[in-house]
Design a protein with these regions (language model features):
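Hydrophobic/aromatic-rich core segments of domains that either
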Residues: 211-234
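Short, hydrophobic/aromatic-enriched beta-strand segments in well-ordered soluble domains
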Residues: 37-41, 52-54, 102-114
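N-terminal export signals
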Residues: 5-24
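Solvent-exposed beta-strand/loop surfaces of large extracellular or lumenal domains
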Residues: 61-94
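C-terminal segment of N-terminal export signals and the immediately downstream linker at the start
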Residues: 20-42, 47
C-alpha cells in the first residue's frame, strides 16, 4: 500500500463526523454529475425456485451524492425494493417459481460530485456529544470485537503516536494500517474482515473488507465512530 495524504481523505472515507456543520466552511464542492446504473440479471433456468438480492446505490442524501430512484422490469413472480433490516442499505429482491427463463433489469439514477475536506485548520470542540444515530458506529461486530487484542493494538498505536484527540488518533491508526497491512491477492472474494483473527496471527494481508475493517475496528476501539463504506466505480 502507498501512503496517502490523510488530511485529504479523512472526510470522505470511513470516519463519521460528529457534527457535519463543523466542516461546513471547510468543504469544497464541485458540479453535479448524473449516472444511470443498469443491472441486467439472467439466472440459470433450472430448479424449482430462485431468489435474488441486488445491492443498490445508497439512498441517504448527502452533500455529495443522492439517488433519484430505481425501477425494474422482468419476469419475476415477486419483486420489491426495500432496506436490509436494521440498516439504511437498499436492495432489490426478486423471486422466481418454477424452472424457465429468469430475467430482470434494474436501473438507478444517481447524482454525485467530488468533495474534499481541508482539516488543516480544523478545531475540535471539547465535550463533544455523539448523536444517537451515530452511536451504532461505535459498536463491536462478530468479526471486529472491540476488546482484547483489538483494543490493546489500538491503544498501543495511539500511545506510540502521542495522539490525544479523535482526529490525531484516527490519523495515527490510518498511518499504522498503511505501514503494516498489505493487499493479499490470494484472499477469497473481498476478504472476511475478521480483524481479531488477523491480529492474533500477526498476518495483516487481505483485501478490501479486511483492510477497511482493520481501520474501522481500531478506530471504534479508540472511541471514534467509523463504518465500512463500499462503492461502485462509475
Amino acid at each position: 500500500m502507498q501512503r496517502r495524504d490523510f488530511i485529504k481523505l479523512a472526510g470522505g472515507a470511513t470516519l463519521i463526523p460528529i457534527a457535519p456543520s463543523v466542516f461546513g466552511g471547510q468543504i469544497s464542492h464541485s458540479k453535479w454529475n448524473s449516472y444511470r446504473l443498469t443491472y441486467q440479471i439472467n439466472l440459470p433456468t433450472k430448479g424449482k425456485r430462485a431468489l435474488l438480492w441486488l445491492p443498490l446505490p445508497d439512498t441517504t442524501d448527502t452533500y455529495y451524492q443522492f439517488t433519484q430512484g430505481s425501477v425494474w422490469n422482468g419476469n419475476a413472480k415477486k419483486a420489491k425494493f426495500h432496506n436490509i433490516p436494521k440498516t439504511n442499505f437498499p436492495v432489490f429482491h426478486a423471486e422466481w417459481r418454477g424452472s424457465g427463463p429468469r430475467k430482470v433489469t434494474v436501473s438507478s439514477i444517481v447524482k454525485t460530485r467530488n468533495r474534499s475536506v481541508d482539516l488543516q485548520n480544523f478545531f475540535e470542540k471539547k465535550n463533544r456529544i455523539i448523536p444517537s444515530s451515530i452511536k451504532r458506529f461505535l459498536l463491536p461486530t462478530r468479526h471486529a470485537p472491540l476488546n482484547g487484542i483489538v483494543r490493546m493494538t489500538a491503544s498501543s498505536i495511539t500511545k506510540a503516536a502521542n495522539a490525544n484527540t479523535p482526529l490525531e488518533k484516527a490519523h495515527a491508526i490510518y498511518n499504522w494500517v498503511v505501514d503494516n497491512a498489505h493487499r493479499d491477492q490470494t484472499a477469497r472474494g473481498c476478504g472476511r474482515g475478521d480483524i481479531k483473527y488477523m491480529l492474533e496471527r500477526n498476518n495483516l494481508g487481505g483485501k478490501s473488507a479486511d483492510l477497511n475493517t482493520l481501520f474501522v475496528g481500531l478506530a471504534r476501539a479508540s472511541g471514534i465512530p467509523a463504518r465500512n463504506q463500499y462503492g461502485i466505480r462509475i
